[in-house]
């Protein structure tokens, strides 16, 4: 185990997602049993005492791969030299808050974090945004980090991707490993479009295997898109462990690459592919290699899918307009 530790910064580290995420990272779930990890944990001042308790638990696990932990409330110190930043912390949506209120509340957070990353992160930094509204938070952070290549920023739609795989596996009676080429298009919101029409079940087209357009439209798409709200209703709290697991999955795929016969969903900077306006952070089917992603090209988009992709892209454009008017980008 001679490799130098990967410096992983996590924001909102004492929160619910952070609590699930840190132990996965420290145990080697990200890069396997041979690469040590140094955790750099950012929290707001009132949460630092709770974070100290989490660090005690990390210590008590005696993880062989955990080479060190640093905590603090100063982003410039915590992000210093970071190779991977997982921006989990965000202002939660409270009762009566509209999404526009959420955009404004989180704008200041991601503006400051983008600037700090720009100043002190390592040259090979990759930034994954989990905190909602994730796509536009990623856009704000990216815009405030002009010296970091824009393709180094991504927002999390892997949770939606995993949810879609799980639902399709249950419907078709196969293992989740039998499903390939699932795609989430657009925003990590209720407008997202989980696309079965290019997915495969044991090598066969998923939509043809399902052979039930009503199920796709009336059950599959809304179940995946609104799963977070359903979990809140059942659990009394938002999905934390699954979001943490998806954050690890997404970072691992980004850093280590996708299999030759599969792709993943990542919200990345649009180059205009599939009619999604250039400059938005939108989810696409992507392949990854050597820490870089590429949007899968050449997929046929039917009329049904076109309408869904356009709808979620329009929401992203509205969010971009809102944060532009707020002076955040």
UniProtKB/Swiss-Prot annotation:
Name of the protein? Malate dehydrogenase
Q: Does the keyword Manganese apply?
A: no
Q: Check the record and name the NCBIfam families matching this protein.
A: MalateDH-SF1, PRK05442.1
Record bears the keyword Cell division: no
Question: Which Pfam family, an example, fits this chain?
Answer: Ldh_1_N
Task: Name the positions where NAD(+) binds.
Answer: 12-18, 106, 113, 130-132
Please list the reactions this protein catalyses.
(S)-malate + NAD(+) = oxaloacetate + NADH + H(+)
Which parts of the chain span the membrane according to its record?
none
PANTHER family named in the record: MALATE DEHYDROGENASE (PTHR23382)
Species of origin: Mycobacterium ulcerans (strain Agy99)
Top-rank taxon, per record: Bacteria
Among the GO molecular function terms of this UniProt record, one is: L-malate dehydrogenase (NAD+) activity
Family recorded in the similarity comment: Belongs to the LDH/MDH superfamily. MDH type 2 family.
Any idea of its EC number?
A: 1.1.1.37
Spell out the catalytic residues: 188
The alphabetized list of GO BP terms reads: malate metabolic process; tricarboxylic acid cycle
What InterPro entries does the database record attribute to this sequence?
L-lactate/malate_DH, Lactate/malate_DH_C, Lactate/malate_DH_N, Lactate_DH/Glyco_Ohase_4_C, Malate_DH_AS, Malate_DH_type2, NAD(P)-bd_dom_sf
- Residues reported in the UniProt entry to bind substrate: 93, 99, 132, 163
Alphabetical keyword list = NAD, Oxidoreductase, Tricarboxylic acid cycle
């Amino acid at each position: 185990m001679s490799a130098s530790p990967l410096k992983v910064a996590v924001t909102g580290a004492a929160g619910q997602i952070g609590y699930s995420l840190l132990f996965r990272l420290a145990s080697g779930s990200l890069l396997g049993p041979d690469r040590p990890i140094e955790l750099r944990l950012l929290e707001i001042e009132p949460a630092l005492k709770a974070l100290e308790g989490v660090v005690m638990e990390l210590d008590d696990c005696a993880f062989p791969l955990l080479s060190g932990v640093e905590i603090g409330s100063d982003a410039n110190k915590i992000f210093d030299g970071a190779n991977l930043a997982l921006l989990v912390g965000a202002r939660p949506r409270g009762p009566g808050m509209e999404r526009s209120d959420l955009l404004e509340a989180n704008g200041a957070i991601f503006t400051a974090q983008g600037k700090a990353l720009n100043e002190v992160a390592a040259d090979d930094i990759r930034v994954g945004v989990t905190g909602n509204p994730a796509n536009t938070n990623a856009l704000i952070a990216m815009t405030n980090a002009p010296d970091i290549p824009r393709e180094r920023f991504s927002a999390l739609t892997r949770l939606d991707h995993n949810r879609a795989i799980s639902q399709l596996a249950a419907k078709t009676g196969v293992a989740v490993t039998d499903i390939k080429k699932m795609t989430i298009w657009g925003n990590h919101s209720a407008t997202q479009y989980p696309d079965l029409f290019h997915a495969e079940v044991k090598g066969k087209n998923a939509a043809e295997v399902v052979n039930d357009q009503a199920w796709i439209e009336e059950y599959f798409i809304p179940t995946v898109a609104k799963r977070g709200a359903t979990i809140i209703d059942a659990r009394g709290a938002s999905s934390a462990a699954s979001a943490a697991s998806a954050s690890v999955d997404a970072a691992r795929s980004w850093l280590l690459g996708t299999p030759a016969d599969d792709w993943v969903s990542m919200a990345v900077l649009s180059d205009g592919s599939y009619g999604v306006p250039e400059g938005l952070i939108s989810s696409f089917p992507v392949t990854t290699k050597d820490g870089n992603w590429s949007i899968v090209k050449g997929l046929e988009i039917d009329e049904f899918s076109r309408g869904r992709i356009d709808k979620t892209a329009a929401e992203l454009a509205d969010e971009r307009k809102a944060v532009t008017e707020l002076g955040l980008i």
